[in-house]
């Protein structure tokens, strides 16, 4: 079950029936110290999500064989489904970044996704390439530190699909 960083630390101590130890408090301190950065990044991502996805597609997919007749993204319907999926990955990576917990991505995005893509003939490699382009575009908008933080969750999705 997905938990935010705070709940995970507290639940771990609670299961053991003890107060938070130094290591647990350090985890919370690290989480809180990056809180403002994560919120600012999420604000920027939310305000620019469509542009992020559009630019990422242009960088990674638009002029490749995948969008030409016979390619897996050919036809408006398939292209629209790809855009929808990339937006979905960006949104859930943003949620996970705010929570400080990638397990949200397992539960809400990755469970069964690779198998579904393979059964539908969706090219996983091209999808991973587009997610990496989202990571680059996002980092250019939110800055290096927030981009690195967000990159953790986009890389997690890429790894889960690979």
Swiss-Prot record:
Compartments reported by the entry = Cellular thylakoid membrane
The Gene Ontology biological process annotation of the record reads:
photosynthesis
- On the tree of life, the source organism's domain of life is Bacteria
Query: What Pfam families does UniProt report for this protein, alphabetically?
Result: Phycobilisome
Where on this chain does (2R,3E)-phycocyanobilin bind? 82
What topology in the membrane does the UniProt record assign?
Peripheral membrane protein
Which residue ranges run through the membrane? none
Residues bearing N4-methylasparagine? 72
User: What keywords does the record list, in alphabetical order?
Assistant: Antenna complex, Bile pigment, Chromophore, Electron transport, Membrane, Methylation, Photosynthesis, Phycobilisome, Thylakoid, Transport
Give the chief site where it resides.
Answer: membrane
Post-translational modification summary for this protein: Contains one covalently linked phycocyanobilin chromophore. The chromophore is added by phycocyanobilin lyase CpcS 1.
Give the InterPro entries listed for this entry.
Allophycocyanin_b, Globin-like_sf, Phycobilisome_asu/bsu, Phycobilisome_asu/bsu_sf
Q: Cellular component GO terms, alphabetically?
A: phycobilisome; plasma membrane-derived thylakoid membrane
| Known function | Light-harvesting photosynthetic bile pigment-protein from the phycobiliprotein complex. Allophycocyanin has a maximum absorption at approximately 650 to 653 nanometers.
Quaternary state and partners of this protein?
Answer: Heterohexamer of two alpha chains, one alpha-B chain and three beta chains.
NCBIfam families reported in the protein's UniProt record: apcB
Family from the record: Belongs to the phycobiliprotein family.
Supply the name of the protein. Answer: Allophycocyanin subunit beta
List the gene name: apcB
